[in-house]
């Protein structure tokens, strides 16, 4: 049994698929990549039992259709320093894989008689959703930092895709911050929703980085599949109903600051090392200026910096958790932002001054107690 393939292509695909594998899996077979050669195409599968990624790679040549499983770390380490070339894979009667390259070879034991789990398939009643890969990537990147990690409320440990007759919301929240991306280009006659868990969302962030094609999402009550180009990902959904996120978004926030996002992010990063373990960063707002303060009296450290802004509203002191505030500013790829507040005890809304086309993106952050 023999096939040939370009080294850089195989190495790139294996590195992407390796991110789904959990080497502490209770099923040792899942520590392996599954290679399936069929009709001149190599189909590679990686899985952790709940999430699977399958990719298709064109071969230079092959002599038969066959499949085998190979340990992921061994083959990844063996290929990563090879220069671009055609690799020859040969499996002998003792189930030893020989990888031949320009100046040498590797011998790796493989499993040809295996019962590798088949990725789950969605039911016949699956809902289908098509979205541009770049749009999906941007919205996942904006949402991931707000996903919860809460064993008591697992429903919050993912990104909610909520489709309505007028728009689709992509939402994440951990109870302290909330991201709501509203896409007006998506409408449905039958409102529906699903919750994408954190791990497959993180995998998608990697897979979609260079995706210029459309992504097809299909899901039922338990599983979802996502397909684009040469990739298909299968994942288990989080079951349950996502909380009413719109109910926590303030409707009246008359105190509004407009500020350069990069400048504000730079100030937050500079003062943050001087804050206490609580990460509290105090923000003082006055007409035409914003002052950020951080202090750690236990170590006699303080920091203060002022930057210009446009502010309409009452003079206000409000506190934010600096690490979260910095993450929020970091995911917004815009020049300037609004920060809208009602008072120092209620949630503040952060949004771009110029929204992306056919989108409405808002980020919510709960304030911290400030002792004046």
What name fits each language-model region?
Residues 1-372:
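Structural preference for solvent-exposed beta-strand-turn elements
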């Amino acid at each position: 049994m023999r096939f040939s393939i370009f080294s850089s292509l195989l190495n790139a695909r294996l590195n992407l698929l390796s991110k789904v594998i959990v080497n502490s899996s209770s099923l040792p077979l899942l520590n392996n990549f599954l290679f399936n050669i069929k009709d001149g195409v190599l189909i590679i599968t990686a899985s952790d039992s709940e999430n699977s990624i399958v990719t298709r790679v064109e071969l230079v040549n092959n002599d038969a259709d066959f499949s085998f499983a190979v340990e992921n770390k061994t083959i990844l380490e063996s290929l990563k320093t090879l220069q671009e070339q055609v690799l020859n894979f040969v499996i002998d009667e003792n189930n030893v894989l020989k990888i031949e390259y320009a100046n040498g070879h590797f011998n790796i034991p493989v499993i040809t008689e295996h019962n590798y789990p088949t990725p789950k398939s969605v039911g016949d009643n699956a809902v289908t959703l098509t979205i541009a890969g770049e749009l999906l990537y941007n919205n996942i990147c904006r949402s991931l930092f707000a996903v919860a990690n809460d064993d008591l409320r697992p429903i919050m440990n993912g990104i909610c895709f909520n489709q309505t007759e007028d728009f689709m919301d992509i939402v994440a929240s951990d109870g302290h911050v909330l991201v709501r991306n509203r896409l007006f280009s998506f409408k449905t006659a039958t409102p529906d929703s699903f919750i994408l868990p954190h791990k497959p969302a993180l995998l998608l962030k990697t897979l979609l980085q260079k995706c210029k094609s459309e992504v097809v999402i299909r899901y039922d009550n338990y599983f979802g599949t996502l397909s684009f180009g040469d990739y298909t990902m299968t994942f288990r959904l989080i079951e349950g109903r996502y909380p009413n996120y719109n109910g926590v978004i303030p409707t009246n926030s008359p105190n509004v600051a407009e500020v350069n996002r990069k400048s504000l992010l730079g100030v937050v990063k500079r003062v943050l090392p001087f804050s206490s373990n609580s990460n509290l960063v105090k923000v003082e707002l006055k007409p035409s200026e914003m002052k950020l303060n951080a202090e750690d009296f236990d170590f006699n450290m303080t920091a203060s910096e002022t930057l210009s802004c446009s502010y309409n509203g009452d003079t206000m002191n409000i506190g934010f958790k600096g690490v979260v505030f910095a993450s929020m500013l970091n995911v917004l790829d815009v020049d300037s932002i609004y920060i809208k507040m009602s008072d120092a005890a209620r949630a503040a809304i952060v949004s771009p001054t110029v929204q992306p086309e056919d989108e409405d993106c808002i980020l919510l952050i709960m304030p911290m107690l400030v002792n004046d």
